[in-house]
């Protein structure tokens, strides 16, 4: 039986709690006591990013034995499992977009498809790809107008269900676009490929 990494479980718990708090704030509005607004602001942006990183770590741990042993058959099995999960999350997320436009699940599914492409890759390539996604985003903002499709008074996105609008929202200016958000999951994959039971590595990071 594999030894659980308690720190990851604790981090997941905090990330989930943080996402719940942030989503409640979005639904119920920003009015309330100043201390409550201050507490919720601590989680904004951080909880979702942390959860995506931890998802990448989880996918790494799921495939680490096969990866380090260069077991192509087991890596293929892991890729099939991840593909099924990615497709499920993508479709479920899209199914309630009209109810909850800020959904992260369909983005999550696309991040996982990118993970599949890099599941056999060396950690340096994984980290380099994450860095590319981060650095490319400001350049994209110089080329394409960020607010295309958005009405920031109502937070409605026009043309979402068109091919152009969907791709733009998914990769560039949605709530959690692939550029740069997929980098968080790739960093998690890179981190999970390291020896997380090595105390000296944990202290360095």
Segments (PLM) and residue ranges:
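Alpha-helical transmembrane segments and their immediate juxtamembrane cytosolic regions
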Residues: 1-205
